[in-house]
A protein has these predicted regions:
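Boundary detector for helix-to-coil junctions that initiate low-complexity/charged tails
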Residues: 1-86
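A nucleotide-sugar donor-handling region in carbohydrate enzymes
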Residues: 69, 73, 77-89, 217-219, ...
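Conserved nucleotide-sugar phosphate-binding/catalytic loop shared by glycosyltransferases and other
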Residues: 96-106, 124, 128-177
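A short, glycine/small-residue-rich beta-strand->loop->alpha-helix junction that serves as a flexible
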Residues: 106-119, 300-302
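Short N-terminal targeting/anchoring amphipathic segment
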Residues: 178-197
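Donor-nucleotide binding loops and adjacent catalytic segments primarily
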Residues: 275-358
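A donor-sugar binding/catalytic signature common to diverse glycosyltransferases
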Residues: 346-392
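C-terminal alpha-helical cap of glycosyltransferases
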Residues: 418-424, 432-447
Length: 447
């Protein structure tokens, strides 16, 4: 018994020693990365420049010129217009033993665009490769959504949720958390969906040379855009989801592989509720005329807002119809009392589409393609002030295809005219869905 106990103690001590050694190595690596981040900071490098001048007094004569110039170069790095020096980047963490695992990183935007595309990709991967583990890492607060589908999810709060944290510190948090995820799960692929790649994320994926790195991004990389100039080269493939409009603009030239994939839609027709079930859940009569309104901005209680003008115009047109207003999970709850109005705060709202007769939508990518796929006669309100997203051109395509009408100037009179006109529209039957050989092909090619 005594020898057995001593053997167990020895074995336990060896395990403790191994665990302690592993922890010490990881702490040393973290300290090394923190030192690199500090040495790469603006304050450190400006101080280094001053110190170098002090060590060689003749350089002090030129300091009034070199210091502003050096500050200017560091400023360009800070806003992404100049790549940081290679010495500021940390060495590779090669690991060829990859697991059947994919990490998806949807950033947080104004709405659900980035998240919805990654959520759709996650579900598509599961359909085509059920054994592949899909893991989310995101600053989006809606963590319950992937949990419902049993997708493990890591969360980091957005920078502006913290009271006192610098961009360097926040990027350090991203880098450390991603490296922990990569070490734990050993993913074979990483996919980012966002307009701006964070430096902490770039530093982390750079340390995983055997991991495939994808960037899903709508539109071209425009010359003069604010993305870090060296960021594209951190990825193996750029994925451009399809759109109703094509751009003729030439973007930034780069050598990274580009793939064009079908429009990314989350909900398939067979996943939608029937008309009867949708209306039952929404609490509207089966025989009623039902309009779905989702504009994404404006206060419903402001009588001059577009959404209030729209509600008033609809009820003036037909006081017996019902209106379902799509409310974002990211915003404050809407408070509006009208027996003909229902507030829908759910995700994804597309499961209710069979319960709607007509729709009034903003001209964003997701809204447009959802209406295009479901073929609900729609009045589009394009945002005319989005520099990177030509919503007007997209909505005009829908008008030309017979899907609906575009209202450029939203007055009550114009809205009323559009309401009357859209009721005579019967969208042509066409397949804009994602359940196609094209989807199977591009998802399979990634895996």
């Amino acid at each position: 018994m005594e020898s057995e106990d001593s053997g167990m103690e020895t074995s336990f001590s060896e395990q403790e020693y191994t665990a302690s050694l592993h922890l010490a190595m990881k702490q040393a690596e973290r300290h090394e990365r923190e030192i690199h981040r500090l040495k790469n900071s603006v304050t450190y490098r400006l101080g280094e420049h001053l110190t170098a001048s002090a060590r060689r007094p003749w350089k002090l004569l030129f300091l009034p010129l070199t210091f502003p110039y050096h500050s200017f170069l560091l400023g360009l790095e800070k806003i992404g217009m100049k790549a940081p020096p290679n010495s500021a980047l940390i060495g590779d963490n090669s690991n060829s033993n990859r697991e059947d695992c994919v990490v998806l990183f949807p950033t947080n935007g104004v709405g659900f665009g980035h998240f919805t595309r990654m959520y759709s990709v996650a579900k598509a991967i599961r359909r085509h490769s059920p054994s592949t583990e899909v893991i989310f890492f995101t600053p989006m607060p809606t963590l319950h959504i992937p949990y419902i589908e049993d997708f493990p999810t890591y969360h980091i709060a957005g920078k502006y949720k913290f009271q006192n944290i610098s961009s360097t510190q926040w990027n350090g948090l991203i880098e450390e958390q991603l490296l922990m995820i990569f070490e734990t799960h050993k993913p074979k692929m990483f996919m980012f969906d966002g307009a701006y790649p964070y430096r902490g994320m770039l530093n982390a994926i750079r340390r995983e040379p055997s991991m495939k790195k994808m960037w899903m991004r709508r539109g071209m990389f425009k010359k003069g855009s604010k993305i870090p100039v060296d960021s594209i080269q951190f990825f193996d493939t750029i994925l451009h989801p399809g759109d109703a409009i094509t751009t003729q603009e030439r973007g930034v030239e780069h050598s990274v592989e580009v793939k064009h994939v079908p429009p990314i839609l989350l909900v398939k027709e067979e996943e939608m509720l029937s008309k009867e079930e949708a209306r039952s859940r929404l609490g509207v009569p089966q025989s009623a005329e039902v309009w779905y309104v989702q504009l994404g901005a404006g206060q419903i209680n402001d009588i001059e807002s577009e959404i209030r003008l729209t509600i008033d115009a609809l009820l003036e047109h037909n006081s017996e119809l019902f209106i379902v207003i799509g409310e974002s999970l990211l915003g404050k709850r809407v408070s509006f009392s009208n027996e003909r109005v229902r507030i829908l705060r759910d995700y994804p709202n597309a499961i209710y589409f069979k319960g709607f007769d007509y729709s009034i939508q903003a001209g964003g990518y997701n809204s447009f393609h959802e209406m295009r796929s479901s073929q609900i006669p729609t009045i589009f309100y394009p945002n005319m002030n989005t520099g990177m997203d030509n919503q007007f051109a997209r909505c005009k395509v829908g008008e030309q295809e017979g899907l609906g009408l575009v209202v450029e100037h939203r007055t009550k009179e114009n809205i009323l005219c559009a309401i009357k006109a859209v009721k005579s529209i019967r969208p042509p039957k066409a397949d804009y869905g994602t359940d196609s050989p094209d989807e199977i092909e591009w998802i399979s090619s990634l895996l």
